[in-house]
Amino acid sequence: MAITTTSRKAAAEQFLQLACTDVERAYAQLVAPGFRHHNVYFKGSASALKEGMAENLRQFPQKKLDVKRSLEEGDYVVVMSHVRLEPNTPGYGLMHMFRFEGDRIAELWDVAQEIPANSPNENGPF
């Protein structure tokens, strides 16, 4: 049975939340065989990104992610979020774009922007 639009967005958000607590479970439950990604800091395989995410979680066990917006079009979901690696820090603004095959994540793109402590923009990053 094909996943619905609403549950695709929920699956993308769930993947990001799980990646902050249980990377292995995030991949087991939500990633498709043959998954590939475009993060420029890691080789393009699922295992390379998964290990990088696991290492980040080991370094920052108090990491928290807050989803700000999710958009969907066809097989694609885009999630804008705010991640704080440690409490009481400005953190990063993130954009993840997921491509789904059925109910699984087949491809992932991501970009991050560090949030300055004293931004001149009164509108904030979100």
Residue ranges and their predicted role:
Residues 1-126:
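C-terminal and inter-domain tail/linker signature
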